Each structure stands twice: as C-alpha cells, then as structure tokens.
Amino acid sequence: LTEKNGIRIDVADPKNLGPIVGNTEALAAIAALLDAGKADLNGSTVSFPLSSGFSGFTDAAGLTKFNRALAARVAVYRKDWPAALTAVNESFYSLDGDFSTGVYDVFATGTGDQLNSAFFPQNQAGEVRLAHPSYATDIETGDDRISKASLRTSPTSSSGLSSDRDVWVYTSSTAPVPIIRNEELILIYAEANIQLGGAGLTAAVEALDKIRTSHNLLPYAGSVSSAALTTELLKQRRFSLFFEGHRWLDLRRYDLLSDVHVRD
C-alpha cells in the first residue's frame, strides 16, 4: 500500500534472508514468478484440491488463465501496457462475459473454517464499516453500484468519519471476496488501451461503455482523449471495485493521493 516499504525476494534461507528491494525490483520479481508459474502449468495435470473459490479454474488451463489475470494486474502496476494487454487476452477476460466470473477467497461456518471479517451487518452500532458520504454524492443518478453503500436508518461515526451509509459489498459472514474477476479485467483492458493511445482509445471507450451500460448508465459522452478517459476509468474503477482493495493503489499510481481524494 505504501509503495515504499519493499519486500524480500530472496527467502530461500530463512536464517539468512536476502535484502529488502524497492517497488520496481519487487514488481519485476512478481511478474517473473507469474511467468514461471505459467510455464510450469503448461502441459501439467493438477492433482491437488482447490477450494470452491476456484470453480471453473481447477485444471491447468483454468489456472493459467487465473495466472495471466494476475499478470495483467502486475503489468498495469509496472506501466507495461503492451504486457498488460497480452496478459488480459490470455486470461479469462470477456467483454461480454459475467462481471463476477473469477477466482475468490471463500468462507464457511464449519469447523476450522473462517468467516469473512469484512462483513458488518447493516445499521450496526459500535464496530461499523462506513462508506464516505462522497460515494453517494459522486455516483451518477441511476447507477446500481449505489447498493454497495446502503443507506443507514440513522447516521453514525467511526474513526472521525460520519456517514449515513454502510459499506455493503459483502452481505453475509460467508460472502466470498474476489481475488480477481472479469470486471477488473475489462477495466485493465480499458486502462492499457488508454495509455497506448491511438486506436486504443476507441477500444477503451467500448470497454468503459460496457461497464457503464451494465450498471444502468448511458454510454460515455465525454472527450476521447487520454486525460479524459483516464478520469473516467478511475471513476469506474472506484465504483466497480469498491471495497476490493484497489482505490488507494489507483490514486497512488496516478499521483492523486491528496487529502481531497483520500476521503473515498
């Protein structure tokens, strides 16, 4: 989240760990690890059990698509736009597919299972998860993603934030949490095309329109420029991927982590 703390890459010897490396080297190592995983999966047979969160992705072909989806995300973080597009097209990305298709962390109530700690009942007092009021004021009229920030029966406060809306993304204690899903891949496809420019801008508009119209909005009618489409992209990522762990990373990537933007 800070992009400054770094990670250790060399951990082969737990008694003699390698140095902490910076963001650029860390992302390069992650990308290389994903590439190695893809190579290992090629022609392999998967013999180990996977949770229900991997439904549809349990064989080598499915895991390769999952691997490429993660590689696309990493490529975006690295600003390697051609690599992002290549990885997206090798993933389970589908412009006309179900937005929820993907791989998930799953939860259950059985012995030894874990509950989703991001679930908080609506209208609860005390320990709450509140949506910033700007989520409701910034969203366009008719956008069905307003349901992710449900209106409370009465406002409350937590950690200095007062709001009349609860975060309502995970609606039960066993609701799955996406690791990566098709809607994010569509947005990655749009972002890479925006950054590549040229004919990519038209492809980006098509992808953004798919997001908009699927959430009850009219097609994009703004300027078809890299700057304007980046603003639109970040808006759609904000509402589509709300409470999935992307917003601050997105703002940091575009140098927008100011007090004005951090609120949401």
Language model: regions and residue ranges:
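Aromatic-anchored glycine-rich loop motif in surface-exposed flexible loops
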Residues: L1-F57, R78, G97-A125
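Extended, hydrophobic/aromatic-rich amphipathic alpha-helical segments that build helical scaffolds
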Residues: L1-I7, A26-L41, D59-S91, D143, ...
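Solvent-exposed loop and edge beta-strand segments that line ligand/cofactor-binding
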Residues: G18-N23, G56-A61, T171-I179
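A glycine-rich, coil/turn loop motif that links secondary-structure elements
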Residues: G53-K65, G222-S226
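Alpha-helical protein-protein interaction modules
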Residues: I211-H215
